[in-house]
């Protein structure tokens, strides 16, 4: 389990308040406007025809609201929601037990659907397409197949790795949507709404400071709000102002772009130890004491989103924007690549003043504010 404050993966303490903070309807749901518009039309059409909604696949980074949307879909349809996950369905019989206990029009939510094993997935195909189960009874020459009719239902699948879904499974979803990262103004609304529910007085400036550091992810925004609330309660008058939020986040070691100490250590190692790269991910991970999986799945995606790190065929490379953010000199080899000149073999001590490349850094930097 990832214990970092800034991870978008679910942590145990998130479960305590996530349920109370979740919106119940599409009207309350903030962000993902295109997805909301489409779902509103599809749900109203299904209700008008008195048919189940087509199966829905939601994919995208963790913490963006896939589970919440599944709950909202069931609420808007006025039916029950049954929740499970790919790893929890180990055998075809487990899936059969779930499907045969559904009521007509129910919504079945399978989180991490990409982790279904192949035998279970093959049982799911006819259930999604024909609302039936094909079960083999017996073995050898005495084996026979029987078909069990199922109530018509809607499957909502969620995954952070859509590329791992097999084509037959993906093709059986009628509605497929990617969830995008949230803008700071959307996160600010989410934080102010959560503050009201939690009984916290938060000023817009304080909410904005938290939003800018939340990596475009509501789960992280709510987590930071709870920690800033603690600082406001103990060190101030209980009000989350801009000043209180900045001081609390400084103590939590979250910088203005949402980088924590793990992100900063990786960038500093890449720039100082390996002259900006390229360097293999195994070597880079070992240099900061992290596993390769943690670097690839947890640390790198946000750094690439900001334009601070590139994955290349030769290895990982820092960018001039990363050097400017950390306030460190730009290695000469990295600067040569930026300018399109042949780069000499990089040296950890061969660098160029960050002042001299300020214009390039400003052009390369990406900001959520834009």
UniProtKB/Swiss-Prot annotation:
SMART domains: AAA. It is found in: Cytoplasm. DNA binds at residues 311, 316. It catalyses: ATP + H2O = ADP + phosphate + H(+). ATP binds at residues 21-22, 63, 66-68, 129-131, 172, 182, 219. The keyword Zinc does not apply. PANTHER family: HOLLIDAY JUNCTION BRANCH MIGRATION COMPLEX SUBUNIT RUVB, PTHR42848. The RuvA-RuvB-RuvC complex processes Holliday junction (HJ) DNA during genetic recombination and DNA repair, while the RuvA-RuvB complex plays an important role in the rescue of blocked DNA replication forks via replication fork reversal (RFR). RuvA specifically binds to HJ cruciform DNA, conferring on it an open structure. The RuvB hexamer acts as an ATP-dependent pump, pulling dsDNA into and through the RuvAB complex. RuvB forms 2 homohexamers on either side of HJ DNA bound by 1 or 2 RuvA tetramers; 4 subunits per hexamer contact DNA at a time. Homohexamer. Forms an RuvA(8)-RuvB(12)-Holliday junction (HJ) complex. HJ DNA is sandwiched between 2 RuvA tetramers; dsDNA enters through RuvA and exits via RuvB. An RuvB hexamer assembles on each DNA strand where it exits the tetramer. Each RuvB hexamer is contacted by two RuvA subunits (via domain III) on 2 adjacent RuvB subunits; this complex drives branch migration. In the full resolvosome a probable DNA-RuvA(4)-RuvB(12)-RuvC(2) complex forms which resolves the HJ. Has 3 domains, the large (RuvB-L) and small ATPase (RuvB-S) domains and the C-terminal head (RuvB-H) domain. The head domain binds DNA, while the ATPase domains jointly bind ATP, ADP or are empty depending on the state of the subunit in the translocation cycle. During a single DNA translocation step the structure of each domain remains the same, but their relative positions change. This is Holliday junction branch migration complex subunit RuvB. The gene is ruvB.
